[in-house]
C-alpha cells in the first residue's frame, strides 16, 4: 500500500462485504457463527455467537469503513455512501437511531433523488420517470445520482447473466388457459408475421412470462389507495403497471374473428391454479429488461440492478423518526419520495409502522430484502418495547421473541413477534 489511506480503504471495503452478509445472517437466523479471521485449515467446530454482539462488531467495522472508503469507486464496488447505508441499517438494528439519522442525512445530501427525466428513454411514448430510473440505461448512466450500490451485469462484462424478470414476474399468458369468450385459444408467443413488433406482439412488449413470482394482493391492491391515484409507481398508472387485460388476443388462428386484436377477458371458468399464474398485474416498469440478442421467447436480458439507492435512505430516515416518536419528521422524509412519484403527501397523523412498510413496498418492490427488513423491525419492536399501533398497541418482548416454548422453537402464535403478525395479516 502506498499509504495508510489506501490500506484502510481496502480494509473498509472488506469490512463492508463481511457486514453485508452478517446483517442478513443475524436477521435470518439470529445467533450464527462469527468469523473474525480467514480460515486457512479445515475446521468443523463452529459455535454460534450472540447476534447482538455480532451487530455491535459490525457497527464498529462499518464506522471504520464509512470513514475510509472513498466516495468515488467503480460501479459495483461499495463506496463511502454504500458503507453509510449499511452502517445506518446496523445502527437501526441496535436502536441507535440518532446516529442512523446523522448518517442518512449525509447520504441523501450527497446522492440526491433523480427528479427529472433522463437517459435515451425519456422520449419514448407511454413511459415516465419511473421507466427512466429503472431502465438498463439508467443503471449504467454515471449522471444517475440516486443509485448508490449496484449488481453489475451487462453485455461484455465477465460474469454477466440475464435477469429473467420478464419470465418470472410476468403472467403465464401463453400457456393456453386464456381463451376467448367463445372458448378459443387467445394468445400466442409468436404472432402473425404482420403483427410482429406491433401492439399485438405480447412477447416483445412484456416478455414470455411463466408467473412464478406473482405479487400478493397486498402488492397488487392493498397499498394503492386514493392517495396514490397519481402515483407513477402504482397500479393506477397503466404505463407503469400491466395486467393480462392490457395485452391482446393475438393467436394467428383468431384472425378474421371478432376477438382478434381485442384485450383479453378473464375466462369465467378459469381455475384458481390457472389464475394464480396466468391472471394478475405486475410492475412492468421494473421488470421489463429488453434483450437485443433474442427475437422470441423474451425473458429479460442483462442489466445492472439497484442494491442501495437514496430513495430507500429517505424511507429509513422516516422509520428512524417513527421510532423516536417524531411523526412529522417521519412524514417529511416519506413525502420526499412520494412527491417525486406524484402521490399525495402524508400528514403526521398518518404515520405508523404500516405506513412505513407500505411505502417501502411501493418504492422498493424487487429491490429490498423484505424478509430481512421485517425481521429487523421485529427485533427493534422487542428491543425498544414500543407499542405497535397496527396491532392494537401490542408490546413485543425479547424474552418471548420465539414464543412461549422458548427461543429454540418456531413461533406459532399471534402476538409473539411483529414479523409473524405482519406476514399473517398481509400475506
Model-assigned labels for residue ranges:
Residues 91-260:
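An aromatic- and glycine-enriched ligand-binding surface/loop that stacks and positions planar moieties
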Residues 211-337:
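C-terminal substrate/ligand-recognition segments
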Residues 1-29, 45-52, 62-75, 287, ...:
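Conserved, well-structured interaction surfaces
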Amino acid at each position: 500500500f502506498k499509504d495508510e489511506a489506501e490500506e484502510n480503504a481496502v480494509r473498509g471495503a472488506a469490512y463492508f462485504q463481511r457486514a453485508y452478509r452478517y446483517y442478513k445472517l443475524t436477521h435470518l437466523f439470529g445467533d450464527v457463527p462469527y468469523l473474525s479471521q480467514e480460515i486457512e485449515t479445515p475446521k468443523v467446530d463452529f459455535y454460534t455467537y450472540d447476534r447482538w454482539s455480532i451487530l455491535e462488531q459490525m457497527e464498529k467495522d462499518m464506522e471504520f469503513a464509512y470513514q475510509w472508503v472513498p466516495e468515488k469507486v467503480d460501479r459495483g464496488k461499495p463506496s463511502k455512501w454504500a458503507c453509510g447505508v449499511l452502517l445506518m441499517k446496523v445502527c437501526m438494528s441496535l436502536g441507535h437511531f440518532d446516529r442512523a439519522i446523522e448518517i442518512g442525512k449525509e447520504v441523501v445530501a450527497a446522492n440526491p433523488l433523480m427528479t427529472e427525466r433522463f437517459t435515451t428513454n425519456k422520449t419514448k411514448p407511454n413511459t415516465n420517470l419511473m421507466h427512466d430510473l429503472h431502465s438498463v440505461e439508467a443503471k449504467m448512466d454515471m449522471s444517475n445520482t440516486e443509485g448508490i450500490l449496484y449488481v453489475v451485469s451487462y453485455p461484455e462484462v465477465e460474469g454477466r447473466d440475464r435477469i429473467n424478470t420478464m419470465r418470472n414476474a410476468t403472467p403465464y399468458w401463453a400457456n393456453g388457459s386464456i381463451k376467448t369468450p367463445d372458448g378459443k385459444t387467445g394468445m400466442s408467443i409468436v404472432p402473425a408475421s404482420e403483427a410482429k413488433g406491433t401492439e399485438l406482439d405480447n412477447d416483445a412488449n412484456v416478455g414470455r412470462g411463466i408467473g412464478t413470482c406473482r405479487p400478493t394482493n397486498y402488492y397488487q391492491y392493498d397499498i394503492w389507495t386514493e392517495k396514490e391515484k397519481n402515483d407513477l409507481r402504482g397500479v393506477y398508472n397503466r404505463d407503469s403497471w400491466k395486467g393480462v387485460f392490457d395485452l391482446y388476443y393475438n393467436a394467428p388462428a383468431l384472425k378474421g374473428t371478432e376477438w382478434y386484436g381485442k384485450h383479453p377477458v378473464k375466462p369465467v371458468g378459469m381455475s384458481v391454479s390457472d389464475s394464480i399464474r396466468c391472471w394478475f398485474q405486475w410492475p412492468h416498469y421494473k421488470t421489463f429488461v429488453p434483450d437485443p440478442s433474442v427475437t422470441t421467447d423474451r425473458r429479460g436480458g442483462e442489466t445492472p440492478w439497484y442494491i442501495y439507492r437514496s430513495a430507500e435512505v429517505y424511507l429509513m430516515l422516516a422509520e428512524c423518526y417513527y421510532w423516536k416518536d417524531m411523526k412529522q419528521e417521519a412524514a417529511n422524509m416519506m413525502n420526499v419520495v412520494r412527491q417525486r412519484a406524484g402521490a399525495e403527501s402524508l400528514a403526521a397523523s398518518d404515520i405508523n409502522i404500516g405506513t412505513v412498510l407500505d411505502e417501502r413496498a411501493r418504492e422498493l418492490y424487487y429491490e429490498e430484502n423484505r424478509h430481512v427488513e421485517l425481521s429487523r423491525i421485529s427485533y427493534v419492536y422487542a428491543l425498544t418495547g414500543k407499542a405497535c399501533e397496527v396491532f392494537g398497541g401490542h408490546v413485543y418482548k425479547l424474552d418471548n421473541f420465539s414464543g412461549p416454548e422458548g427461543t429454540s422453537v418456531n413461533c406459532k402464535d399471534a402476538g409473539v413477534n411483529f414479523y409473524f403478525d405482519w406476514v399473517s395479516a398481509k400475506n
